[in-house]
Amino acid sequence: MSLKFARILGVNVTIENEENILEETRKYFLKSEIPRLIRGRRNPKSEKKSINPLIIFTPNPEIVVLAQKDDEYKRIVNSAQINLPDGAGIIWAVNRLEKVKIRRVSGADFMLHLVKLAEEKALTIGIIGGRGGLAVEAIECLQKTFKDVKMEALGEPEIDTKGGQAIDSENYFQNLKNDIDKRKIEILFVALGFPKQEYFIENIKIQISKSKKFRPIILMAVGGSLEYISGRIPRAPGQMRRAGLEWLWRLARQPWRIRRQLAGGEFFIKVLMTPNKKLLF
């Protein structure tokens, strides 16, 4: 991919506008269309060629702080082809350290863009995670707007992780990969919260990569986006989102997030202590 990144405290952050990032996802599916034809015949070499899953994460200050303390987690986050700049803290850090002004790319909004893309290209979407039937509720809400999209809930797994490895779950991921193949899922949204969802995506990516099949799939960590989409939690007003205060809105409705905000304070201090360097690549 040709997207530009900045490295913030060792974590890659995509520094492109939303449309450029979305265009890369379109290109991913365009390059992967099968079967490829040569003079009206299938090209067996193309059909045998495998393609890597396209990984999309949404690193926020808390994720960056954890990545600094956990090298394996940092490796996983940095392995993503797209790391959306979702959050005022990340935008501020990129501006301060890289002297680059970028706009926020909301993970929840980008998820909706991918659902629209799925409708345009007749792709099948899978959603995994969310508690108490949240994925099913989100699908019902999405299908009111995107009536022609095929979407399926794939369960609410309780997968423990340690050091980047899923515990006693190899069979689960193998079965999940088989289920993804059977249902022909081409976009998989994982809503397990960090860091579990990033570890989860790494494990399913490994299983998918083993198959060596020429079939594209996007794996995106969507965190709390299902709560917004389902209507369980109202989104902050547009003015608050534009001002970078959506975190305050969520904190007021979910006080348990205070521990995460403390990690955000640690991020703020570390950025202030980091010399300004241009680390674009």
Regions found by a protein language model. Give the residues of each.
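Conserved beta-alpha
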Residues: 91, 95-176, 183
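Short, basic, low-complexity termini and linkers enriched in Ser/Thr/Gly/Pro
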Residues: 1, 31-37, 41-51, 144, ...
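Short Gly/Thr/Asp-enriched flexible loops that form oxyanion-binding sites at enzyme active sites
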Residues: 139, 198-207
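A transmembrane-helix-recognition feature enriched in membrane-embedded lipid enzymes
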Residues: 89-94, 235-281
